[in-house]
């Protein structure tokens, strides 16, 4: 029942552009011709960067590639993806601090871990942008960054799962190894962050 697929580059071993093109080509050829594809570029984890030239080459070859999710704090790269003579990709940002800048540059949205917990702010920013309230959107963006900064130093996936449990989205915050369980002081910090967020947003649970 999936509406589309996100395809990530292979990890660990570095590949040149030709090898990456062949990889994506082989995966996409195994899909129905009209099945929407997003390239998921997270070079900090895969070590294999999908550069703008490669994205355009892939989009020229495969009409069902509709966009890219880019997870790196590089606004110039966002602009490079969108400045093209060919088909313009739907660009989703995976870096919370660039959400508003991505929209202002021509991106269409975000796919974000913290957004699954603090969704009121992310949806408000998007609505403010759509309504032309750029000053309001900038203030909301600042709030998003402030919360993200408070999470620095706590292991990311365990922190998100703990917050999702606090939010009532999941029943357990257990993570598989090698991710470690959070310490009690780390959980306490997350509880304080979530409580402060609920107070600011007027959330009563």
Indicate residue ranges for each PLM-predicted region:
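Active-site beta->alpha loop and helix N-cap motifs at the rims of alpha/beta catalytic domains
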Residues: 1-47, 57
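Hydrophobic alpha-helix-in-membranes signature
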Residues: 9, 35, 42, 62, ...
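Residue-level detector of functional hotspots within protein domains
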Residues: 23, 54, 77, 165-168
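C-terminal alpha-helical cap/extension of soluble enzyme domains
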Residues: 111-114, 118-205
